[in-house]
Amino acid sequence: QEPDRPQPFSEYTVTVQAEGYRSVEVSAIDVFANVTALQEIRMEPLDISQKEGTENIVVPPNTLWGDFPPKIPEDEVKPVNESGEIVLSRVVIPEYVIVHDGPPTDTRAQDYYVRYRDYIKNVASSEIYSTWPEATLRANILAIMSFSLNRVYTEWYRGKGYDFTITSSTAYDQKWSFGRTIFSNISRIVDEIFNHYLSRPKVQQPILTQYCDGKNVTCSGWMTQWGS
């Protein structure tokens, strides 16, 4: 894979209206050629006392196109014998994760309760292009899942006193975006392999599979998204 220029997708705005419900407008929706884009819309019913209004959602750019901070390097296998550390006894595929929508220390950032599969689909749709070959999509999605399950298994943030599973900051974790458009081929692959992860011989925990784009940021020893 090579970096695409110019912009490899079009952007659209979708407005959804229904009587008795608050309207929703989603802007900056990515649409790629020959790939079905899926946009979830959740509408809130209006109370009698409420006036009609519109919820505005702006989808951030894909990390391959936008400007985001690079990942701060960490050990791919976390120590699990430290006194007082919280760690699960076995690898568990969670039904839900709690996503902190910002850096760990940002107390103003909102926390979202997200189904694990939906979280992976969101991150993959935020981090890679849906037009890439199937084998490339699978490799990247597997890395995303292993990273996520390492955070779950080690209870990384809860062990530091936080009440969430993972953040949406690319400096610490992976990009997750509220209202993100999901792509049908990415959704299908996640449904097929959602309980898979990478590990090392004699290592029980999923490894923290860190990666970078390989163009704007280089990362020796990590997977690069361009060229994967």
Regions of interest found by a model, annotated:
Residues E2-S228:
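Conserved, single-site charged/polar hotspot
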